[in-house]
UniProtKB/Swiss-Prot annotation:
Region of interest (Transactivation), residue spans: 115-129
Residues modified as Phosphoserine: S109
Keyword Acyltransferase: no
Protein name: Transcriptional activator protein
């Protein structure tokens, strides 16, 4: 009978090797805004919202490759309905983010400080002696 302290735990390398064998199958979708998303194959017919537009990830859009992996050809099957919906509840995106207006007064977190011009000459003479 072997001592249990001499036994080594099973190596995690074997589990990693098995996990790396099978590549995650996903599909790339290029959106009109220039962004690209990758959808897992098992996530078919689910939707998502991106920049205020709702996208439906149905089987309408898919990419298949001829020749090398760098030569995509987009294939469109017949549409069942609209794929992109405008969400009225979300604000429409703007390429320029508005900046808050600057206030003239002092910030609320700081007390109102007196102007340095309000101090008389004797005050400055005492400081710089």
């Amino acid at each position: 009978m072997q001592n249990s302290s001499l036994l080594k735990p099973p190596s995690i390398k074997a589990q990693h090797k098995i996990a790396k064998r099978r590549a995650v199958r996903r599909r790339r979708i290029d959106l009109n805004c220039g962004c690209s998303i990758f959808l897992h194959i098992n996530c078919a017919d689910n939707g998502f919202t991106h920049r205020g537009e709702h996208h439906c990830s149905s089987g309408r859009e898919f990419r298949f490759y001829l020749g090398g992996s760098k030569s995509p050809i987009f294939q469109d099957t017949t549409r069942r309905g609209p794929v992109v919906h405008q969400n009225q509840d979300l604000p429409h995106p703007s390429p320029v983010q508005p900046q808050p207006t600057e206030s003239i007064g002092s910030p609320q977190s700081l007390l109102q400080l007196p102007s340095l011009d309000d101090f008389d000459e004797s005050f400055w003479a005492d400081i710089f002696k």
